[in-house]
Amino acid sequence: MAIERYFIKEGVKEMLIDEYLEKELRRAGYGGIDIKKTPLGTKVIIFAASPGYVIGRGGRRIRELTRILERQFGLENPQIEVEEIKNPYLNAKVQAVRLAQALERGIHFRRAAYSAIRAIMRNGARGVEIRLSGKLTGERAKSVRFYQGYLAKVGNPAETLVSKGYAQALLKLGVIGVKVAIMPPDARLPDEIEVKEIVEEEVSGNEAQ
């Protein structure tokens, strides 16, 4: 049980760090983190479309982030590395954050989702799925799914080949959850069914989970 509690605690900590960095580094095209324990401390890889923004002038921002990760989140001797995302349109986290920003700017959810899908597919993705959940048009919360192309949904391919990202948009009606899944150009699987047009459908309560 002690080991289980440790991994749960570490998982929660990584989630909280991810949420914090998403807010702080939105302008950098934040695309997620990878945290690894090392003999010298904790290695933290930050994926971003604009590494220069993460580093800051004279390294000021990255030093401040290092201090916060150590003092606020309890990471032991954090060593931050920044890895550039070569194509932000194929990183699901970046796209989820950008879509959330579009919703916060007042762009209609349908227009924002369609625009994101077209941009992602133009950049070579084999498939993409977007799920928006919350009070999108009124007082009743609902979940809407948009998708195009081919996307592995179950099994090992879904875990290893599909880029997944989540973000939240804070609107007057409440919080909108934004989930994005992207199948990259180099993913190849047998027995594929491809959807050539963008499809939109409202998802029932159970399916939306």
UniProtKB/Swiss-Prot annotation:
SMART domains the record matches: KH
Domain KH type-2: 17-86
Sample GO molecular function, one term: rRNA binding
Classification via CDD domains: KH-II_30S_S3_arch
One Pfam family this sequence matches: Ribosomal_S3_C
Record keywords: Ribonucleoprotein, Ribosomal protein, RNA-binding, rRNA-binding
SUPFAM superfamilies tied to this protein: Prokaryotic type KH domain (KH-domain type II), Ribosomal protein S3 C-terminal domain
GO biological process: translation
GO CC terms in record: cytosolic small ribosomal subunit
PROSITE patterns: KH_TYPE_2
Family in the record: Belongs to the universal ribosomal protein uS3 family.
Classification via HAMAP family: Ribosomal_uS3_A
Assembly with partners or alone: Part of the 30S ribosomal subunit.
NCBIfam families: PRK04191.1, uS3_euk_arch
Purpose of the protein: Binds the lower part of the 30S subunit head.
Name listed for the protein in its UniProt record: Small ribosomal subunit protein uS3
Source organism of this protein record: Thermococcus gammatolerans (strain DSM 15229 / JCM 11827 / EJ3)
